[in-house]
Amino acid sequence: MTRDLLPLSPNLPSDLLAEIEGARDTLAASKASSTRKAYASDWAIFCDFCDARNVEALPAHPDIVALFAHVQATGGTAPVTIGRRVAAINHHHKEEGFASPSARDAAGVIAHMLSGVRKKYARKKNQKAPAEAEKLMAMLATIEGDGLRAVRDRAILAIGMAGAFRRSELASMRLADLHFVAAGLKIDIPRSKGDQEAKGQDVAIPEGRFIRPVALLREWLKAAGLSLIDPVTGKPSPEPVFRRLTRSDLVTSAPITDKTVARLVKSTVTAAGLDASIFSGHSLRAGFLTEAAAKQASLFKMKGHSRHRSLDTVADYVRDAAMFDDHAGEKFL
């Protein structure tokens, strides 16, 4: 529940009431919808924890929050998730007009507990295998024919890897986001996981000579009869780029889902003779970064293309790709 900006009263002027409601909507947009949903779920979990132990959730004492973090860790919750849940608790307190537990005098216990949780319950990163260029081309080769499903699936894989897109970004891509230019294609990403302020970002995809992602996308648009301009309004079309197909392979108006991408990756890596258990929808995004790192692309260019917030995250792909380059034991092993 969001704290009121002003005490509401039916006696307030209607213009002021409308302004307050509008301001509430703006406040609600301060965090990505996925973050708001996660915070709401995290707060409910904390409330259940407090109810079961007959302690107060709001305002919560720092010791209770620290105990919550410990119990979560012993129950198998990942340290990163516990950190987010503590952030959700702090956020809810501030929303309700209370000092956050992490800002109170005895708050040091929370920071120390989180540090201990990270050290004691640290998990090895379970990274999925990247679909680099060679693997992606093997996956594309398994999709035979020129039917709508084959044409669509090839475009999804190629654009997904070429743009280092998240599954959700492929599913939410709209025709109005596409801009074909002489060098290839620019795709607008109105909002992404790392872009909570919704500034939007452009992703440039060259024509290419090997995977040819832009050509494969053009083939899908032509085969499905999709136009970037709405024929009725004359404006850029808000309709989805990648559509669901019926069982008889007819194009629908509904967008694919992120699960569509994940299933497509799994099925094509299996058909290519690869181990599907180590691949996921993220393999397309990871594949671009791993391939770019192997080709010694600029770290900053890679970060800009993948829209990562942290340069360290991108640097991990470079380290993985260069693990055997100039190896310390090369001259004696």
Feature-to-residue mapping (PLM):
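Extended, non-catalytic subsegments within catalytic or DNA/protein-binding/adaptor domains
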Residues: 1-333
